[in-house]
């Protein structure tokens, strides 16, 4: 039997779905036959039953926990929070500048609540479906098609996320090194070449961390990464009171004019608005323009963490669905506040002049400011330490798809990890710009992972609730909303390509 699939067992109502086995890498061998319930468990609600092996049926609950999770509650919060936060935080001020403060808060609230609701659906489906593997839930619900849909969505979304992180390394790290070494002419210097640097960082930092088998070890790097993002947020708030207005507008316009004279095609769309002294420092609460349509995909992608939910759940100490939902609520609320504050203070610093990447806007105003240089280092550290966490669900998906029935092998484990990292590096090095491709893949995959797959799995696998129940109707509405969001976002991106219009990045 696969590690994450077990027979049913009675537990108390306060501990629904407590204590699955922790075995993300399939290194244990178990009997393949599922046990039937004894009669004295027959009246227990299926949602409040647990899974165990046939050979241990009838034993007390504490005797069935052969491979309990080992990751603490706090470390799980760190891991999930780090899976949520990412490069999207750099684009949220741009999203607010193109939606207005009030509309942005409304969208951010709805997206965060919907994302948390989909985590609830996913955990409940995992309990009812008897599996802690995303792809296996897809297989149980819709056969091979469901398995491929889950695996493909996970892989697409995470490779897109990894690419965005490594693109930040590629373009920001050379600038940091150049500022630290005071080198004006970087021609021919390999250590100022972004392609070489992204390869070096991948080999020296990312690969060793990615080879860990247990996510708990990365909790420490997750905590450090989150501290880097908190530092970034603090600097964004402080700079709001240090950068005068409307002086920064004039500086941005001058920078734009200089860029236009040397590189006419390098115009930044966020700077193309007419600026008046009256409007340049006045916040807007509702804005609708050609760039507003990119706000929803940016926000959706910013909250995608669902491929990492089940692995984190599997390794949670004293795990139960209620305990994991508490982990999720804390993580989502913390990221909601971080996203809101970063977007708000970034927007109130530059207003409609904010660019699609917030750090670039600061560099246009303050140049080589020491504090901003430290922020760049912090962001680089954060995204670098996030990549190993993102690799885990990709490797799990590939392993389950290709080698589900095989025992764990370090050679296979390492080969899959190196292959994933190598493919992502090739994308970053050889694709001139991944923004449009990433936007299309991110919009489709993120909508699949947040809206469509969890609700579809829930409707199919949770048998104890009739289709006319409030829960099933809510899940169906959630599914239809996901289809609408996915098709709408993809259509708008295609229209953006057709009309060759500049778009916002994530």
From Swiss-Prot:
It is a multi-pass membrane protein. GO terms for cellular component: cytoplasm; plasma membrane. Residues 1-76, 124-158, 210-217, 314-329, 393-413, 458-472 are cytoplasmic. Residues 97-102, 178-188, 239-292, 351-371, 435-436, 496-506 are extracellular. Polyubiquitination by NEDD4L regulates the degradation and the activity of SLC38A2. Na(+) binds at residues 82, 386. It catalyses: L-alanine(in) + Na(+)(in) = L-alanine(out) + Na(+)(out); glycine(in) + Na(+)(in) = glycine(out) + Na(+)(out); L-serine(in) + Na(+)(in) = L-serine(out) + Na(+)(out); L-proline(in) + Na(+)(in) = L-proline(out) + Na(+)(out). The keyword Magnesium does not apply. Residues 1-96 are annotated as: Regulates protein turnover upon amino acid deprivation. Residues 1-23 are annotated as: Disordered. One of its GO terms (molecular function) is alanine:sodium symporter activity. Disulfide bonds join 245-281. The chain crosses the membrane at residues 77-96, 103-123, 159-177, 189-209, 218-238, 293-313, 330-350, 372-392, 414-434, 437-457, 473-495. The modification Phosphoserine is found at residues 12, 21-22, 55. Keywords: Amino-acid transport, Cell membrane, Disulfide bond, Glycoprotein, Ion transport, Membrane, Phosphoprotein, Sodium, Sodium transport, Symport, Transmembrane, Transmembrane helix, Transport, Ubl conjugation. Pfam families: Aa_trans (PF01490). Glycans are attached at residues 258, 274. It is found in: Cell membrane. GO terms for biological process: alanine transport; amino acid import; amino acid transport; cellular response to arsenite(3-); L-glutamine import across plasma membrane; L-proline import across plasma membrane; L-serine import across plasma membrane; neutral amino acid transport. Inhibited by N-methyl-D-glucamine. Inhibited by choline. Allosteric regulation of sodium ions binding by pH. The keyword Disulfide bond applies. Symporter that cotransports neutral amino acids and sodium ions from the extracellular to the intracellular side of the cell membrane. The transport is pH-sensitive, Li(+)-intolerant, electrogenic, driven by the Na(+) electrochemical gradient and cotransports of neutral amino acids and sodium ions with a stoichiometry of 1:1. May function in the transport of amino acids at the blood-brain barrier. May function in the transport of amino acids in the supply of maternal nutrients to the fetus through the placenta. The extracellular C-terminal domain controls the voltage dependence for amino acid transports activity. Belongs to the amino acid/polyamine transporter 2 family. This is Sodium-coupled neutral amino acid symporter 2. It comes from Pan paniscus.
């Amino acid at each position: 039997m696969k590690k994450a699939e077990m027979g049913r067992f009675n537990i108390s109502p306060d501990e629904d779905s407590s204590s699955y086995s922790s075995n993300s890498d399939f290194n244990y061998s178990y009997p393949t036959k599922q046990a039937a319930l004894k009669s004295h468990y027959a009246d227990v609600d299926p949602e409040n039953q647990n899974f165990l092996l046939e050979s241990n049926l009838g034993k007390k609950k504490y005797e069935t926990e052969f491979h309990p999770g080992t990751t603490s509650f706090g470390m799980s919060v760190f891991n999930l929070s780090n899976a949520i936060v990412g490069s999207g935080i750099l684009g949220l001020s741009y999203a607010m500048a193109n939606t207005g403060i009030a509309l942005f808060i409304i969208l951010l609230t709805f997206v965060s609540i919907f994302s948390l609701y989909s985590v609830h659906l996913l955990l409940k489906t995992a309990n009812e479906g008897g599996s802690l593997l995303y792809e296996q839930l897809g297989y149980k619900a819709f056969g091979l098609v469901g398995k491929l849909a889950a695996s493909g969505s996970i892989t697409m979304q995470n490779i897109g996320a990894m690419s965005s992180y490594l693109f930040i390394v590629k373009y920001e790290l050379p600038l940091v090194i150049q500022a630290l070494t005071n080198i004006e002419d970087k021609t021919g210097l390999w250590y100022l070449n972004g392609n070489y640097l992204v390869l070096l960082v991948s080999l020296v930092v990312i690969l060793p961390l990615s080879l860990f088998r247990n996510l708990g070890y990365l909790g420490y790097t997750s905590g450090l990464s989150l501290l880097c993002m908190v530092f970034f947020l603090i600097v964004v708030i402080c700079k709001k009171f240090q950068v005068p207005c409307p002086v920064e507008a004039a500086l941005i316009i001058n920078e734009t004019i200089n860029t236009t004279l040397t590189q006419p095609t390098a115009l930044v769309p966020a700077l193309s608005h007419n600026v008046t002294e009256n409007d340049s420092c006045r916040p807007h609460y509702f804005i609708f323009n050609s760039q507003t349509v990119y706000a929803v995909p940016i926000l959706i992608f910013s909250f995608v963490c669902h491929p990492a939910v089940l692995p984190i759940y599997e390794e949670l100490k004293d795990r139960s669905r209620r305990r994991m939902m508490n982990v999720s609520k804390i993580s989502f609320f913390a990221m909601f506040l971080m996203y809101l504050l970063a977007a708000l203070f970034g927007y109130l610093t530059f207003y409609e002049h904010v660019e699609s990447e917030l750090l670039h806007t600061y560099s246009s105003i303050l140049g080589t400011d020491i504090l901003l240089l430290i922020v760049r280092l912090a962001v680089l550290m954060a995204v670098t330490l996030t990549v190993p966490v993102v690799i885990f669900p990709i490797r799990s998906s590939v392993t389950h798809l290709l080698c589900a029935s095989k025992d764990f092998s370090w050679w296979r484990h390492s080969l899959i990890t190196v292959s994933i990292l190598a493919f992502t590096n090739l994308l970053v090095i050889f694709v001139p710009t991944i923004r449009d491709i990433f936007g299309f893949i991110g919009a489709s995959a993120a909508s699949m992972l947040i809206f469509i797959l969890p609700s579809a799995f829930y409707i199919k696998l949770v048998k104890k609730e009739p289709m006319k129940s409030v829960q099933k109707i809510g899940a169906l509405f959630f599914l239809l909303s996901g289809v609408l969001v996915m098709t709408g976002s993809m259509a708008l991106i295609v229209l953006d390509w057709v009309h060759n219009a500049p778009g916002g990045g994530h």
